[in-house]
Amino acid sequence: MTTQPDSMSAIDFLIFMEHPVSLSSIADEYYTIVPRQEVKALSSSNQTMNEEQEHSCMRIIRFLHCRVKLSGNRNVLNANYVDGYEHKRKYIYTKSPCANNVDEYLQMMWDKNVEIIVVPSRSENDVNFHQYWSPNEGAVIEYDNFKIETLEVTTKPQYILTLLILTNRKGRIHRISHFEYTAWPVYSICHDLRAFLDFVSNINEQYTYLEKHKPSRQTRSYNCAFASMVTIAQQYFVYLIPVLQNSKRRE
């Protein structure tokens, strides 16, 4: 006889997170999903491959099993598929590009049909960060294989939503919604979770809108890529959002 886990509403979750041991409890639950030895092996492999790229910020835990490949079977550095709550390989976790690999980054967004990019936090001290799009509406930046136009910028108290148009050499276009969370403290996990939940909720609304308005014949491989360095706490919250939504639907 299997025991069904207790459901938790979003409000109950926020109350739970106020408890001092809540984060360790979430970590314990995470390790019941992903074996510790797998995390250790993946972290060790990642350290060997990217040791020169690691800074003082927390390393991304590789949830899952394989790296992203472009056409020609080329691996994309710092890009891994990640399972969602109900779907395999629902997300791509990656780093924002450096100045010398923007084309490779944009090629991944194009090849994998990514329509939403999420930047949960940006380290102001990361010297390798390169803003590959313009903050000004109507501006266009050209690269070797792509040009990217900033169509619209919407600034909210906790995040910035930028609508981008990616154009390849053949003149074909691809639209991307770029969400950047601006309220997360760079060196602390102490934060108002309601603001972060609101951020994720707005991403989900955009996802629902895209699903509703996609052409009937269009297939979509990957809707969302998480860019930049994602903290462990943020990974837990993003993973738990659909869990909470699913439990709410059952209430």
Swiss-Prot record:
Residues 26-251 form the Tyrosine-protein phosphatase domain. GO terms for molecular function: protein tyrosine phosphatase activity. SUPFAM superfamilies: (Phosphotyrosine protein) phosphatases II. It comes from the Viruses. InterPro entries: Prot-tyrosine_phosphatase-like, Protein-Tyr_Phosphatase, PTP_cat. PROSITE patterns: TYR_PHOSPHATASE_PTP. Belongs to the protein-tyrosine phosphatase family. This is Tyrosine phosphatase-like protein J3.
